[in-house]
Amino acid sequence: MLRIGHRGARAYAPENTLASFKRALEIGVDAVELDVRKTKDKQIVVIHDADVKRTTNDEGLVSELTLKEIKNLSADGEKIPTLEETLDFLDKKVKVFVELKETGIEEQVLSMVHAKGVEKNVVIISFLEDALKKIRELDKGVETGLIYAKHKNPIKAALELKANYLFALYRFTHTANVQKAHENGLKVVVWTINTPEEVEEYIKKGVDGIASDKPDILTRVNA
């Protein structure tokens, strides 16, 4: 089972920063999950929200700020990294789930993945089905995953998108869903689990990976 640090180890360091990814590596994760968006000057940065307000000392839309302006922000004492910086830092040590938070960045993200030679380490995931469709049109080989909370038929959607993973909100994930996904050749990752009891529960359900803000709870279990 994949032990995945959600936005690094966001319970212990500012989310989506190199400090957070460093902490996740120190804990001993198998993978990290991160989010990407495009700046005003078309640079791919690692940040979850469309606005920088929640995670930095300023406010404004990522899409309306240049990379230089974003680099001047403080994320609780840390800097917002670019995707390139993050891939360099992780250096193929772990699998990387890259969540596309917007459309229109698919080609750029793929180009970076190929330039760094990390195609085998990266899984591109998104709630945005159009983004996943575009990724698959551009690249038949890279792994992808459909993220969802509530979805009428996520397995059907994932198969139509030729995805490899379902990235499911944990409380809507049941043993029968996991078994059906596996029967259809899909791997199931659940997010976001932050208690040891729930970790054990979802391991028993047969999931292929768990994403946690506290990834140390994942490294304590045998799976």
Residue ranges of each PLM-predicted region?
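Phosphate-group recognition and catalysis centered on beta-loop-alpha active-site segments
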Residues: 1-223
